[in-house]
Amino acid sequence: LTVAPTISRHHRYRTIASKTLEQAEQTLLKHPEKKESLDDAVFQMEILLPLEKEGLVRLEHIRPAGKPMRPREGVLVSSDPHGLVFRRIFSQGRYDGLNVPIQEGDYGLTEIQEGAWSVKHSYFTRNHQLIGHYYNINSPVELYPYGARYLDLEVDIIQRAGEKPTLIDREKLVLLCRNGCISQEL
């Protein structure tokens, strides 16, 4: 049995960048001291650069039963080795959880961090006044060349401008545990 060192996100890269993965891990085998720099370089080349080139971000929000929600898409505002921010424009409806009507010209900034257990959505008026924040609690976020993916844990935290944060939908999380969709430990 042979054990070989791997770079971070090995299985993800196997599906999206197998040649780059193979080259990086060959280098790692010869130079284990370069692991951190290899991790950073491959992440930059295979995840962040394609996102920056495209300029668009797609957020895949998967429900615990396996059913994906309609992907949220927006324009990339910024990215760094830890994550990214993208902007969405709204025109109608109500803000999820905040129960506030959407006005024309309102926009949202979504902050995504690789490996984070939450995704932060901040909503603003067209005049840049904060409406509120919506924190989606989820499995650790995985970044891809097109955007991000995570499993929604159904419980969220909302915070209207000037108010304290509030936990919502806790009963959905309890039901998921009771039905065996997610573990009690999770």
Regions found by a protein language model. Give the residues of each.
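Charge-rich, low-complexity N-terminal segments
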Residues: 5-105
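Short helix/loop capping segments that flank catalytic or ligand/cofactor-binding pockets
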Residues: 67, 96, 144-145, 168, ...
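Phosphate/ribose-recognition catalytic cores of enzymes acting on nucleotide-derived substrates
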Residues: 98-143, 148, 154-155
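A hydrophobic, small-residue-rich beta->alpha segment in the mid-to-C-terminal subdomain
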Residues: 151-186
